[in-house]
């Protein structure tokens, strides 16, 4: 079976556009600094710019999720460095290629993504030139013609890790407070099913899938 890939940036932009089309108010460029409590239940969120009142809050803050809200839970950032190069007709793979050192992901716009590291480096999102060069060399070992490709970009992201390497999904003890995080390297791939099951949980419906093993309260003594 041929392996496919998803462009997280394109998917994110499309999701925002679709949400706005359905009448959802989207606020970007603001940092959530506090989850508000009112009479023992969720009251909304405070950002670095304003506050929003709401009876339900879903914490999807990734590696930062565990430090927000009335009850904390263990999440940690796991750094991943990547780079992209400008592919061409003769050096762009038609499918995902993997080796023990690196993987290559072709994009529809001609780019080739090369990744990715797994680093316990805290919230440091800086790229390391030596690491980027090492991944580039590993990619050239798989496709030597990429040596003629121009490096377009290098970046680092922070994946949300958990102590047992499982996602954190479901309600917290505070009424109206829900969590969806901890997907590590598979967050973008699990977005559809996560959104589907969390919508059921938030609206009080029985989840289509059993997510009890992912409950955020499993970490509480």
For each feature predicted by the language model, list its residue ranges.
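Helical element adjacent to the flavin cofactor pocket in flavoenzyme catalytic cores
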Residues: 1-48, 52-56
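Generic structural signal for well-ordered, non-membrane alpha-helical segments
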Residues: 4, 8, 12, 128, ...
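Active-site catalytic microenvironments for nucleophilic, acid-base chemistry
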Residues: 18, 60, 64-67, 197, ...
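Hydrophobic/aromatic beta-strand patches that form the interior of the parallel beta-sheet core
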Residues: 27, 58, 178-180
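Active-site substrate-recognition segment that forms the wall
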Residues: 52-175
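C-terminal catalytic lobe of FAD-dependent flavoproteins
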Residues: 143-221
